[in-house]
């Protein structure tokens, strides 16, 4: 109760002056608040002319009006905001801007940033220029990877061209190895055949007797066997390389065929012995390349080995018999009896001695007499008869009974 009385006493003790001051202060504050609420910023419209430059040439001028506050100078930011509204966002980023400004007795272009003030040229005239941005560093940076790719392209081509022949040589070497494995097993059979051909070529009438006629015939006869051998080798290599390039999956089949050859079923490419091998295939001794490999028991493998050994022995015997027949034929023929004696040929009744080997110059060829042609035709007939005999002997070895095979295998084991 006492506290309330004190407060009332204080309020009653206030002077009227203090009351008037407080009222005036409140009124002034209210007026200021009303002025702030009712007060609006005052803007102005500024006329701006701008040019655009492309390829170093000024285009026709453009005119715009920019709104800016009266108490602030015109800035480039205000113009850019207006341009983005009128012509899009890319307009401002594609050009570098500068304003026309009086300098001494003339005018200059003053480069501007975004927050820089635009100075008027004459009184209140604002002129701007927008020039295309040319970043040389960006052009160089863009051109460098292109030049690098252009330079890398020939390098990559060179590397590819170097790698391709290596791959080709690798496949070719594989083919040569495969052919070499097949040829190693057939060397024993080819040696006898080569000895026979060398002996017949050294004792033929064309190799010695035709020297007096012309040197061209002698060279052609000597080069024919070499050419045939080289042609056969090239054919085998080309076939093997083509197979490796076209069908790289054929390698396991080749390996299977090589294992079969090692087991005792040789496959020989000879043309004279083709008929015999076809007959053997018909009997069931040899499996062709194109069939899938079948699972064989150890007993069947041993039988196949024995059959292969017997086939090889029979072929060797036939070759030896053929050589003996050729030797007998050559010994019976008087023309091949004395190869070291002086050789003479008859041409229309006149005798022409053989020319020595030291003479290299080619002489004009002479026509051979009828007697020589008759002798040559006889030789050809005899050769045909021998071939027929060979074919007959090969046909006899068509199928071998198993009893003979078992007996021969027992003899081999002994």
From Swiss-Prot:
GO terms for biological process: cell division; plant organ morphogenesis; protein polymerization; regulation of cell division; regulation of root morphogenesis; specification of plant organ axis polarity. Residues 44-135 are annotated as: DIX-like oligomerization domain. GO terms for cellular component: basal plasma membrane. It is a peripheral membrane protein. Expressed during embryogenesis and in roots. Residues 173-192 have a biased composition (Acidic residues). A motif (Association to cell membranes) lies at residues 283-284. Its main location: membrane. Residues 230-242 have a biased composition (Basic and acidic residues). Homodimer. Forms long polymer filaments with other SOKs proteins polymers (e.g. SOK1, SOK2, SOK3 and SOK4) crucial for polar localization and biological activity. Binds to ANGUSTIFOLIA (AN). Part of a three-gene cluster containing FLC, UFC and DFC, which is coordinately regulated in response to vernalization. Also regulated by FLX. SOSEKI proteins (SOK1-5) locally interpret global polarity cues and can influence cell division orientation to coordinate cell polarization relative to body axes, probably by guiding ANGUSTIFOLIA (AN) polarized localization. This is Protein SOSEKI 2. The gene is SOK2.
């Amino acid at each position: 109760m006492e506290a309330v009385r004190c407060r009332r006493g204080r309020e009653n003790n206030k002077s009227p002056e203090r009351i008037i001051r407080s009222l005036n202060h409140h009124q002034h504050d209210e007026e200021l608040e009303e002025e702030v609420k009712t007060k609006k910023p005052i803007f102005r419209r500024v006329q701006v002319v701008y040019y655009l430059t492309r390829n170093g040439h000024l285009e026709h001028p453009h005119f715009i009006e920019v709104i800016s506050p009266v108490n602030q100078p015109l800035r480039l930011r205000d113009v850019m905001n207006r341009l983005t509204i009128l012509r899009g966002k890319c307009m401002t980023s594609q050009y570098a801007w500068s304003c026309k400004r009086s300098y001494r007795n003339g005018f200059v272009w003053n480069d501007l940033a975004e927050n820089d003030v635009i100075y008027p040229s004459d009184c209140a005239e604002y002129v701007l220029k927008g020039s295309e941005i040319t970043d040389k560093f960006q052009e160089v940076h863009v051109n460098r990877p292109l030049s690098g790719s252009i330079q890398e392209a020939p390098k990559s081509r060179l590397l590819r061209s170097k790698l391709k022949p290596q791959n080709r040589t690798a496949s070719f070497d594989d083919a040569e190895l495969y052919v070499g494995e097949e040829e190693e097993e057939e060397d024993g059979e080819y040696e006898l055949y080569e000895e026979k051909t060398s002996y017949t070529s050294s004792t033929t009438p064309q190799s010695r007797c035709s020297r007096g006629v012309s040197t061209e015939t002698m060279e052609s006869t000597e080069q024919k066997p070499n050419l045939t051998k080289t042609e056969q080798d090239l054919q085998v290599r080309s076939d093997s390389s083509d197979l490796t390039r076209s069908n790289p999956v054929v390698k396991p089949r080749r390996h299977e065929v090589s294992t079969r050859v090692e087991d005792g079923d040789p496959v020989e490419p000879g043309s004279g012995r083709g008929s015999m091998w076809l007959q053997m295939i018909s009997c069931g001794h040899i499996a062709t390349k194109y069939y899938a490999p079948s699972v064989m028991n150890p007993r069947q493998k041993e039988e196949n080995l024995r059959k292969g050994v017997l086939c090889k022995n029979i072929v060797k015997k036939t070759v030896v018999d053929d050589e003996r027949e050729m030797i007998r034929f050559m010994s019976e023929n008087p023309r091949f009896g004395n190869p070291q004696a002086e050789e003479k040929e008859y041409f229309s009744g006149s005798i022409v001695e053989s020319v020595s080997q030291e003479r290299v110059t080619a002489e004009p060829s002479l026509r051979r007499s009828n007697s020589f042609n008759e002798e040559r035709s006889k030789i050809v007939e005899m050769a045909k008869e021998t071939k027929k005999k060979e074919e007959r002997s090969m046909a006899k070895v068509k199928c071998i009974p198993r009893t003979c095979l078992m007996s021969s295998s027992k003899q081999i084991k002994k």
